[in-house]
Amino acid sequence: MKIHLLKMSEQQPTDYAFPEKARRASNTSAPSQKRRDQEDLNRRPSFFGRVPAIVWSGAMAFVLAVGTGGIWTVLLTSNLATSPAIPWSVAVMALFLWTMWQYLGGRWWPRSTSQARRRYLRARSLPGRVFAWAVAAGLLSTIALVGYWIVLLQVVKIPTRVLPNFFSYPPLTAILVLIMASLVSSLAEEASFRGYFLGTLEQRMSGPVAIVIAALLISPGHSLTQGFLWPIMLWYFFSDVTFGAMAYLTKSILPSALVHSIGLLIFFTLVWPYDAQRRQIWETGANTGFWIAAVSAIIFTVLALLAFIQLALVAKQRKP
């Protein structure tokens, strides 16, 4: 009995007997989330250390977006000039876009970069509620942007963009070309700028700053086709901020890619073909169409902002 009691006394006291000591030990052995966040922040490189990654990512995004559009332009021009009845350019471009999307999403060589490519593309599926609010916010913004565009062309003198009259070609060619034209710019821009580039920026700075930088970088790309005019660049800046906000809040480019494609299809068919007919208000006065566009732009801007607020709430709720 004495031997047993002696052994019991030689054992180290348990932490249950000293709760304060156990709590201190727990705090020292498992750093708090705040401390881990601070340590992660301290490990981040300085601003000059971040620049190379940002520069390379931005350059890649710009080349990919502009280059993809250039490839489509060459294919389409050749197709319409040689055999407009057979829309072979659409098939070739579809294969190119599929290959691009697969590679950016992590397929094929090199395997060592597969996970990184998949992560940076950010083509993640979303819960139905988050996806629905993201699409709603994007579509409401698109309607507002249509109104602002119509108002802009009647307030500021801007050289109008002359588009090919696709409806003068065979119906099948016209329909397929318009659909592909809407997909080319949207998929390339969303993958490169709202996927790779914005994802890189978000790791190194706040979300709003990252959205603005990404929108500023793509502006010259839009100006290559629309002209280097400040009203046009400002309009495109806000449209790019819209898509950037969708990608930032959802951490996915799927909603913005869908809305971007729908928006381009609307502009290709209902807006841009009629730009040449719009006259400045100081020449003809503000007609009914002008006021409808102006009021619609304001109303749908408010609705879009409310939808984005709701999107931010539902997106935050799904995070663990």
Where is each model-derived feature located?
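Functionally important transmembrane alpha-helices
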Residues: V66, P231-A286
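Membrane-interface helix/loop boundary segments of multi-pass membrane proteins
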Residues: A188-I213, Y248-S252
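Juxtamembrane helix-loop-helix connectors linking adjacent transmembrane helices
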Residues: L75-I86, Q115-A188, Q203
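Membrane-interface helix caps and helix-loop-helix hairpins in membrane proteins
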Residues: H222-W230
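Alpha-helical transmembrane segments in multi-pass membrane proteins
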Residues: I54-Q115, W133-A134, V295-I298
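C-terminal membrane module of polytopic membrane proteins
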Residues: S261-P320
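Low-complexity, intrinsically disordered extramembrane tails and loops of integral membrane proteins
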Residues: K2-R44
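Hydrophobic alpha-helical transmembrane segments
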Residues: V55, A59, F131-A136, I175-I179, ...
